[in-house]
């Protein structure tokens, strides 16, 4: 079965297929949206030439979602909890954004979906992600078990030269934790349990609140960048690439140990998702860069930001 092959092979297949989907179907979808006059009503931000983009086809996020979901359904391990979370997040926010675009375009309501309903949807996803990360037995980290060992250096006459104490790694164990990490910083682990005094209920509540904040903030942040040529996709591509590399390192026990970063079993599968995600964004950038032939609309921007947020939560970065 192709899903049992190496992650690198499946990631390469995912990024190629995502690019092909956008290239093959992108032009057809753009032409269809033009014929149906599904255009963008540009917000006037005072930028030169901005209002000339009024009428540019929107809802191009459908192309991105299609180019993400098809490769991951073909090449991803669907029994992996992280892949399940990413698929749910993509579809969930894609539907919310799609409903917003539908109201704007077909109901001719510039406001689109009420802001409170968007927030409710984002908060709901944050609760699902935070609760799953807390409760799922498949989501664990591997922590090193150390023991202090004291070494004493003696002179020939038996007098002490130096006494050195160091921690020796005895083994590693899988455990549930609310720790997160800051990449590229030494001693970078932070445990939310430290703030709540290790109280289980309070720690869970804090962890879910953090998940809600991250999902809502990043999703809305990405939403604000749409409407300018290539901005949302151009910013997102390097972010997804870095997250993909971090997922690969965090899911590889040898590299994680060598680089002294948190080892997260099964998180390496997220590399396949990141590859499909990056391929979809790069392909879409071809049509979205200046002069933009299509905008992703809320269908794409809400999903892109939310998926990036959930990805970062999954790899605890």
Predicted regions and their residues:
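Short capping/connector residues at structural and topological boundaries
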Residues: 43, 47, 56, 64, ...
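Glycine-/proline-rich flexible loop or hinge segments
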Residues: 11-17, 46-55
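Short juxtamembrane and helix-loop transition motifs at transmembrane-helix boundaries
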Residues: 44-53, 85, 108, 192-200, ...
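Alpha-helical transmembrane segments
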Residues: 3-30, 64-95, 102, 116, ...
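Individual transmembrane alpha-helix segments
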Residues: 183-213, 219
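Select subsegments of transmembrane alpha-helices in polytopic membrane proteins
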Residues: 53-65, 117-123
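Cytosolic, membrane-interface loops and tails of multi-pass inner-membrane proteins
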Residues: 29-52, 102-111, 173-185
